[in-house]
């Protein structure tokens, strides 16, 4: 069952407010969203919460309802931002799950502060530089092309997306999308969607790690996930057929099942979970 209703909260940090959704009870799971996944409680979140975990889903700086945090200029700054978030939540060593851009942040966090990560799950994580397998440039794509690129079977356009002739566009949605695209560019435009030093530092990851890759990832080629799995000591690897980049959206039940099985096999040590309530 995926009927957990999340609570909406705001954390007050030195640089501004962080918006988050939290639901479920049990060992804490910090979920770091993809570039387009701020502010939503997805079916995957509900499934994981219903499986006996407390899911905590914050919005990155400049995304969703979180403040800008203008001093955060790169992914390295986001690492320290999320260490502040962990401290504010009273979390010592939570499970950390990251999707795409959020997976990159999660990997850097596990490299920089391995003692703060109970387990690590990476889904279609960005962050590596593989010249033979470049990351798609979503900034240059029209919205329809983005949807076709993110999914193996793109969902039909919602009724809200189809406007009658003469109907004004949703300016709030346009402004929010522009803000988030600007924030993403601030963090990862140069070098583009990668940290050239990350690959050689992945040996520092000590947490149990699961790397999940959709076989039909047209945004971040599957070779990136395979490289993550090869470089992180002891990492488990799972490749899901007939699925696109946004696997946690396209196949939430399958992804939740893989994550639940992995987290259940790697429970947090007694006294280290930092359960926040």
Question: Which residue stretches match the model-derived regions?
Answer:
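Short beta-strand/loop motif that positions the catalytic acidic residue
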Residues: 205, 211-213, 217
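Conserved HGGG/HGGXW glycine-rich cap/lid loop of the alpha/beta-hydrolase fold
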Residues: 16-65
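Hydrophobic, aromatic-rich cap/lid helix
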Residues: 171-200
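Active-site loop/oxyanion-hole signature of alpha/beta-hydrolase fold enzymes
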Residues: 56-97, 257
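Alpha/beta-hydrolase fold catalytic core
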Residues: 1-29, 50-53, 92, 260-277
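Conserved alpha/beta-hydrolase "acid-adjacent" motif
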Residues: 218-224
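Flexible "cap/lid" loop of the alpha/beta hydrolase fold
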Residues: 107-112, 118-149
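Catalytic histidine-centered segment of alpha/beta-hydrolase-like enzymes
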Residues: 243-256
